[in-house]
Amino acid sequence: MIINSRLMFRLKYLNILGSKAELAALPEGKLLINTINAHSYNTARKDELFAEALTNGDVLIPDGVSIVKACRWIKAKRLPKERIAGWDLFEFEMNKLEECGMKNVECGVNGEECGMNNSSLDNSRSASADNSCSGKRLYEPSAKLKTQNSKLRSSQRTVMFMGSSEKVLDLIVKRAAEVYPHLKVVTYSPPYKPEFSDEDNKAIIDAINAVNPDLLWIGMTAPKQEKWTYSHWNELNIHCHVGTIGAVFDFFAGTVERAPIWWQRHGLEWLYRLLKEPKRMWRRYIIGNTLFLWNMVKEKC
């Protein structure tokens, strides 16, 4: 179903993923995976293109306890069983690709298909970084990469991070090298501006297509990242899962602290962020959560 107006955007009609088990069962190939929470719902009610992007992507993940509870209360089309945070998506996909990279190295076969299992959801392995690209050009592989064993190099799987700043991407590369040693990490930092020019868009698309990654993360904050990916989806000649997870870039890089486990388990991650950054977050969570509740009352009726 194609949404042509933000006025048609309703939580009760969205095809939201139900569980982590469903996440593990997603098919391989080119898939656009977005997340939805109370804030993105409110934004989509005012932004037609964002509403289209969330509705017409391949997978929509409930990144918020409020979404899970609201779906049950309004008796939505899909009733998700649990929250799946953007971080959960990130860890699952990265662990899966890392496992595949390990198997390829063990077998010494380039491009061998790997079987995955649900245990990847609970593993905490992470990824490596061997080359990066930023701005408008792809950088050449480092000397260290060039001298690696050819079998290992050819069997590596590639993950690409598109978005954020050079500083954050450098931190991502360093951490990935420690926790995902069987993956090759490529990064691209787009220009920092509200709207990209045609030249900017072409440079980004060309960079992604040149890398042709096995996994692509887009991190430009919502709704920009979802709208950009949706608008240029047909121009991306790639074969992999694509996730729009802006905040996760900062979490993984360590530039933003994620809420402790207790807060996460009790669905209070939003409150932790509000207490940490009240000046920046009060409007989003105090006014935004109230607006979300009011919209749910209207959907219920």
Model segments located where?
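A transmembrane-helix-recognition feature enriched in membrane-embedded lipid enzymes
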Residues: 69-72, 258-301
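Short, basic, low-complexity termini and linkers enriched in Ser/Thr/Gly/Pro
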Residues: 1-2, 97-126, 131-136, 140-156, ...
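Proline-aspartate-enriched helix->loop->beta-strand connector
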Residues: 205-222, 229
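Short glycine-rich anion-binding loops that position phosphate/pyrophosphate groups of nucleotides
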Residues: 38-41, 220-225, 248
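Conserved beta-alpha
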Residues: 74-98, 156-207, 211
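Short, flexible loop segments at boundaries between secondary-structure elements
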Residues: 190-196, 238-276
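N-terminal nucleotide/polyanion-binding subdomain common to many enzyme families
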Residues: 1-91
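A short helix->loop->beta-strand "cap" motif at the edges of active sites that frequently abuts
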Residues: 30, 157, 237-241
